[in-house]
Design a protein with these regions (language model features):
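Hydrophobic transmembrane alpha-helices and their immediate junctions
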Residues: 22, 208-209, 242, 250-252, ...
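Alpha-helical transmembrane segments of multi-pass inner-membrane proteins
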Residues: 130-155, 174-176, 181-225, 231-244
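N-terminal signal-anchor transmembrane segment
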Residues: 2-70, 86-92, 383-385, 400, ...
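A membrane-periplasm/extracellular boundary helix in multi-pass inner-membrane enzymes
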Residues: 142-151, 245-284, 301-305
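Aromatic-anchored transmembrane helix interface
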Residues: 80-86, 96-120, 128-132, 137
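Helix-loop-helix junctions and helix-breaking kinks within/between transmembrane helices
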Residues: 41-51, 91-106, 185-188, 210-244, ...
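Transmembrane alpha-helices of multi-pass inner-membrane enzymes
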Residues: 62, 376-387, 391-433
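Long extracytoplasmic/lumenal interhelical loops at the membrane interface
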Residues: 37-47, 273-347
Length: 433
């Protein structure tokens, strides 16, 4: 079963449609390039006094989202969440957020909504996107080697935009080992980029040997960044690809992956962990224990204290917007280290339900036997696994691929619904003529 063959729309597309697809894919490529070389570009653009130009791809994402939303065909569930999204923004305003907070949150999530409404164009132009992603993967691997073997000038560099100090590249270490970020801003972002770029390129590879070699190189590079969650997620995703034809096994695993991500932050509230023992032993699980003991319980307690468990803090009160436009008393919502908790802190119970909607999304992609479907399935599973300990909505490229997967499934569902009446043909019986 093929959910949404991208070539179908492209075969009969007009010149205008062709131009729109080209613009969309160029915006996506510009976003991917900026995120891949973010650390280096911020350093050199700041030196040249043109650092604001780095934000143009996300601005273009917002503009294309607004243009495509007018004609985007989606079901009631999508529009219900759009309304909930708007109401959540009003709730955030009641919780002392400013319009700047809402605007910056929309800016941060712009790749997701852009990928969602423009998914058909991105799938149609996937070969052009493939060349860009292939280049960015090679650059990311080269960046790992460069950062590991030399001293790059943008390492630890900070700069100012207006009165706000921003980091071009975060320098830090884990267990006295430098966390390699390459050309990117942060090591964990680099590892996510390598994982997603590799999984995307699998769609175009025919040789299993080449796929195995590429996955081995990618996994080694991710390990060099010392990012544990992306390394484990990528390895598990590769295992899932080997059993993807066992549909019911894949379904069960997907349900487990989603519910573990949803319930993991609550584990520290019901169980006791000895942080001192783990920290003193230098265990690789020390960061996870820190989240279980400090980060996640503190966020949950803050939601309970403020009475925001059901409604959430609101759209504009969670994530990096708290660092740029802080709201007094809400600084704890700057980072969750878990995407399910991120959504819950933002939207309340609705956020939790939104996170569980990954299950039907993954089920639809499991049913899809096309190369596009398999690619989006692997990226979506990897996305969900990394989200256990990462705020994935703060990673632009992760947002782009999440929007692409959601838009792909929504578009396929709408096409299936509109094509059903055409499948019904009534013919008169010969004896009744």
């Amino acid at each position: 079963m093929e959910l949404n063959p991208a070539n179908r729309a492209g075969d009969s597309s007009s010149i205008i449609s062709f131009d729109k697809s080209t613009v969309v894919v160029l915006v996506a490529i510009s976003l991917i390039l900026v995120e891949t070389f973010s650390g280096a570009l911020r350093f050199y653009f700041d030196k040249a006094g043109i650092s604001p130009l780095l934000y143009l791809p996300k601005v273009a994402c917002i503009l294309l989202f607004a243009l495509e939303l007018r004609t985007f065909k989606a079901g009631r569930l999508f529009w219900t969440f759009v309304i909930v999204w708007a109401v959540s923004g009003l709730i955030a305003m009641l919780h002392r957020a400013s319009p700047h907070n809402l605007a910056f949150s929309l800016f941060a999530l712009s790749p997701l909504v852009f990928g969602l409404v423009c998914s058909e164009h991105l799938i149609h132009r996937r070969k052009i996107l493939c060349w860009a992603i292939g280049f960015c993967l090679l650059a990311s691997l080269a960046g790992v080697a460069l950062d590991k073997l030399t001293a790059v000038p943008w390492k630890g560099y900070s700069y100012n935009v207006g009165e706000t100090e921003l980091s071009a590249n975060t320098t830090w270490s884990a267990d006295d080992v430098d966390r390699v970020a390459g050309f990117a801003r942060v090591s964990n972002v680099l590892s996510i980029l390598i994982a997603f770029y590799t999984l995307y390129l699998f769609m175009f590879l025919r040789s299993r040997l080449v796929m195995m070699l590429l996955s081995a190189v990618a996994l080694y590079a991710i390990v060099l960044t010392t990012s544990k969650a992306p390394a484990g997620a990528f390895a598990l995703t590769m295992g899932l690809l080997m059993i993807q034809r066992m549909s019911w096994t894949c379904r069960i695993l997907c349900v487990l992956v989603v519910f573990i991500g949803l319930l993991l932050p609550t584990l520290g509230m019901v169980m006791s962990f000895d942080a001192l023992t783990v920290s003193s032993s230098g265990s690789s699980l020390a960061s996870l224990y820190d989240r279980l003991i400090n980060t996640w319980p503190n966020v949950i307690n803050a939601l309970i204290r403020e009475g925001w468990v059901l409604t959430g803090a609101g759209f504009g009160m969670v994530g990096s917007t708290m660092g740029i436009f802080p709201v007094e008393g809400s600084e704890i919502f700057l980072g969750m280290d878990n995407s399910a908790l991120y959504l819950w802190a933002m939207l309340g119970v609705v956020g939790g339900l939104l996170y569980t909607l990954q299950i039907p999304l993954l089920f639809k992609l499991i049913e899809d036997e096309s190369r596009v479907g398999r690619m989006l399935l692997s990226i979506s599973v990897c996305w969900c696994l990394i989200s256990w300990t990462t705020d994935m909505f703060e990673v632009a490229v992760a947002n782009l691929f999440a929007g692409l997967a959601i838009g792909y499934v929504i578009t396929a569902k709408q096409e299936a619904m509109t094509s059903r009446p055409a499948d019904l043909h009534l013919t008169a019986l010969p004896n009744l003529r």
